[in-house]
Design a protein with these regions (language model features):
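Short runs of predominantly hydrophobic/aromatic residues within well-ordered alpha helices
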Residues: 27, 47, 64-69, 110, ...
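Short, well-structured alpha-helical segments
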Residues: 23-31, 44, 68, 107-115
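His-Asp-centered metal-binding catalytic motifs of divalent-metal-dependent phosphohydrolases/nucleases
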Residues: 50, 64-80, 89, 112-118
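An amphipathic alpha-helix signature
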Residues: 7, 11, 27-28, 51, ...
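Short, flexible active-site-proximal loops enriched in glycine and acidic residues
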Residues: 60-66, 82-85, 102-106
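Histidine- and acidic-residue-rich, metal-dependent catalytic cores
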Residues: 33, 89-121
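Divalent metal-dependent phosphate-bond-processing catalytic cores, especially two-metal-ion Mg2+/Mn2+ enzymes
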Residues: 1-16, 35-42, 52-61, 73, ...
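Active-site metal-coordination segments of metallo-dependent hydrolases
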Residues: 36-46, 78-91
């Protein structure tokens, strides 16, 4: 996604909430976070891919501005040694929305959307379903991009010994494969489900 497209998405998201976009400092700080050196997958590449999906499918959202901002913040805090990244990112999102003058209800909904990216429960509501489907769209990517994604994830956890890391990674992929459906929205299910299952099966068998 081009810098111009990122800027346009950012401004449109705030406008949809009925508030002016904060000055560029917040957006640039988020982009700086996604460029941190410990990241290999959870980068501006991932954020740009997510926002590109959102731009194409935003008609599926009930509150599109909130979904877009949840995407911007969903990996804002990313420490591979921590277990509260989503909670910290969600708290930052809520604080940013409150500071910009968004309603308390909107801030809480965005907080909940970011927390849903823990992928530990079935998403509830159209916006959560769309957000999670977009976050998981990489599983249904073309083979070359999926394989790149797997390399990127392994690079982020390169400090974990391979004999521990590989079985853990297979177990995570197995859990996605075991779901009755990986994607909740009919649109993304139709576009990505079959290829996601092919990618997961191939990676698990490797």
């Amino acid at each position: 996604m081009t810098p111009q497209a990122l800027h346009a998405n950012w401004n449109a998201a705030w406008q949809a909430l009925g508030v002016a976009a904060p000055d560029d400092a917040l957006r640039l700080e988020l982009q700086r976070r996604y460029g941190e050196p410990q990241r290999h997958y959870h980068t501006m590449q991932h954020l740009g891919e997510c926002l590109a999906w959102f731009d194409r499918e935003q008609a599926l959202a009930e509150r599109p501005g909130e979904v877009a901002l949840a995407l911007w913040f969903h990996d804002a805090i990313y420490d591979v040694h921590a277990h509260d990244n989503e909670a910290c990112s969600a708290d930052w999102a809520r604080q940013a929305l409150q500071a910009a003058g968004a309603s308390g209800a909107a801030a809480e909904r965005v907080h909940a959307l970011v927390m849903a990216t823990r992928h530990d429960a079935v998403p509830e509501g159209r916006d959560a379903e769309l957000l999670i489907d977009i976050d998981l769209s990489i599983l249904g990517a073309e083979r070359a991009r999926f394989d790149e994604y797997e390399r990127q994830v392994h690079a982020e956890y390169g400090f974990v010994p391979e004999e521990i890391r590989l079985p853990r990674r297979r177990a995570i992929l197995q859990r996605f494969l075991a779901r009755p459906a990986i994607y909740a929205t009919p649109r993304l299910h139709a576009l990505l489900e079959a290829r996601a299952r092919e990618n997961l099966q191939r990676s698990i068998a490797a």
